């Protein structure tokens, strides 16, 4: 496949790159190629020169993701420090790089007296990831605060898409495979930095109390069904603490799967499927994965 991948890049291009260290579950195989572009132009040039049949996907902080043990075909693109900047645009708007974390976005908003973005602190990922999936927490979603975003599409062209063109639904957008969110603008409203910090502290405490944050986990495993909570259905089906190999349903929060130490991705995904089977038998509900599963078994 090396002939299909441009070799003249300014960023870092790594063949057969281990992905387990880069994802929260700490499991899974390698990427055929891992590309960490120097800047937006480097990413554009790379995608423009990449054979069109080669699959492309973006990797942020590696939460919300199972990388299967057989590895990921094609190119995995990881946005580094050059894409992690956050800057104030006006009194209520921030311009955020696709590699910036939710914590950085919410903290910058606080420092500039911009309220309404506190919930982004609790999303364990980067701007590129939570813009793509309409990430949310504590009653708010990206669609509530997004103005527009810059996307490098598979051909290497960069386009700016307003909120109205993203087709947002619950944890979903219509962004095409292979398109990379490199920047986004978020709008809040004027607020007091101390009050903003207090709300961020409240959210942090709620997460700490209810979620297994010190574990190797992928975050929320299943989408909440209409009118219900995934964790309640998992609990009702008797899955709290259920284990397959090194993979376990968290005792603390049943919508979280954890790697207890040496789990394979096959064990983690298999546990998720067993939970889905038991919930279907118990409640008649087909739970839908929120965690993305990628690669070869």
Curated annotation (Swiss-Prot):
<feature type="active site" description="Proton donor">
    <location>
        <position position="220"/>
    </location>
</feature>
<comment type="pathway">
    <text>Cell wall biogenesis; peptidoglycan biosynthesis.</text>
</comment>
<keyword id="KW-0560">Oxidoreductase</keyword>
<keyword id="KW-0133">Cell shape</keyword>
<dbReference type="InterPro" id="IPR036318">
    <property type="entry name" value="FAD-bd_PCMH-like_sf"/>
</dbReference>
<keyword id="KW-0132">Cell division</keyword>
<comment type="similarity">
    <text>Belongs to the MurB family.</text>
</comment>
<comment type="function">
    <text>Cell wall formation.</text>
</comment>
<feature type="domain" description="FAD-binding PCMH-type">
    <location>
        <begin position="26"/>
        <end position="191"/>
    </location>
</feature>
<feature type="active site">
    <location>
        <position position="290"/>
    </location>
</feature>
<keyword id="KW-0961">Cell wall biogenesis/degradation</keyword>
<dbReference type="InterPro" id="IPR011601">
    <property type="entry name" value="MurB_C"/>
</dbReference>
<dbReference type="GO" id="GO:0008762">
    <property type="term" value="F:UDP-N-acetylmuramate dehydrogenase activity"/>
</dbReference>
<dbReference type="Pfam" id="PF01565">
    <property type="entry name" value="FAD_binding_4"/>
</dbReference>
<dbReference type="GO" id="GO:0071555">
    <property type="term" value="P:cell wall organization"/>
</dbReference>
<dbReference type="GO" id="GO:0009252">
    <property type="term" value="P:peptidoglycan biosynthetic process"/>
</dbReference>
<dbReference type="InterPro" id="IPR016167">
    <property type="entry name" value="FAD-bd_PCMH_sub1"/>
</dbReference>
<keyword id="KW-0131">Cell cycle</keyword>
<keyword id="KW-0573">Peptidoglycan synthesis</keyword>
<dbReference type="Pfam" id="PF02873">
    <property type="entry name" value="MurB_C"/>
</dbReference>
<keyword id="KW-0285">Flavoprotein</keyword>
<keyword id="KW-0274">FAD</keyword>
<dbReference type="InterPro" id="IPR016166">
    <property type="entry name" value="FAD-bd_PCMH"/>
</dbReference>
<dbReference type="InterPro" id="IPR036635">
    <property type="entry name" value="MurB_C_sf"/>
</dbReference>
<dbReference type="InterPro" id="IPR016169">
    <property type="entry name" value="FAD-bd_PCMH_sub2"/>
</dbReference>
<dbReference type="GO" id="GO:0008360">
    <property type="term" value="P:regulation of cell shape"/>
</dbReference>
<dbReference type="GO" id="GO:0071949">
    <property type="term" value="F:FAD binding"/>
</dbReference>
<dbReference type="InterPro" id="IPR003170">
    <property type="entry name" value="MurB"/>
</dbReference>
<dbReference type="InterPro" id="IPR006094">
    <property type="entry name" value="Oxid_FAD_bind_N"/>
</dbReference>
<feature type="active site">
    <location>
        <position position="171"/>
    </location>
</feature>
<dbReference type="GO" id="GO:0005829">
    <property type="term" value="C:cytosol"/>
</dbReference>
<protein>
    <recommendedName>
        <fullName>UDP-N-acetylenolpyruvoylglucosamine reductase</fullName>
        <ecNumber>1.3.1.98</ecNumber>
    </recommendedName>
</protein>
<keyword id="KW-0963">Cytoplasm</keyword>
<keyword id="KW-0521">NADP</keyword>
<dbReference type="GO" id="GO:0051301">
    <property type="term" value="P:cell division"/>
</dbReference>
């Amino acid at each position: 496949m090396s002939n299909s991948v441009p070799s003249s890049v300014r960023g870092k291009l790594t063949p057969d790159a281990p992905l387990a260290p880069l994802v929260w579950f700490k499991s899974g195989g390698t990427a055929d190629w891992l590309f960490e572009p120097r800047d937006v132009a480097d990413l554009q040039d790379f995608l423009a020169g990449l054979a069109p049949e080669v699959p492309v996907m973006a990797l942020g902080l590696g939460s919300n993701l199972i990388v299967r043990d057989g590895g990921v075909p094609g190119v995995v693109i990881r946005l580094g420090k050059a894409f992690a900047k956050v800057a104030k645009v006006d009194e209520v708007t921030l311009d955020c790089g696709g590699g910036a974390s939710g914590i950085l976005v919410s903290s910058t908003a606080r420092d500039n007296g911009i309220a309404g973005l506190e919930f982004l602190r609790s999303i364990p990922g980067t701007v590129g990831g939570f813009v793509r999936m309409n990430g949310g927490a504590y009653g708010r979603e990206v669609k509530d605060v997004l103005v527009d975003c810059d996307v490098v599409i598979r051909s290497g062209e960069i386009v700016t898409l307003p909120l109205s063109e993203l087709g947002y639904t619950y944890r979903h957008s219509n962004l095409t495979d292979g398109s990379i969110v490199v920047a986004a603008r978020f709008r809040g409203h004027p607020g007091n930095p101390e009050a903003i910090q207090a709300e961020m502290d409240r959210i942090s405490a709620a997460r700490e109390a209810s979620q297994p944050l010190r574990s190797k986990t992928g975050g929320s495993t299943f989408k909440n069904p209409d009118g219900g909570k995934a964790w309640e259905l998992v609990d009702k089906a008797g899955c709290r603490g259920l284990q397959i190999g090194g993979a376990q349903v968290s005792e603390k929060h049943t919508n979280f799967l954890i790697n207890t130490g040496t789990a394979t991705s096959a064990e983690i995904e298999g546990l998720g499927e067993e939970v889905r089977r038991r919930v279907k038998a118990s409640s008649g509900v087909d739970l839908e994965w929120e965690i993305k599963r990628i690669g070869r078994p």
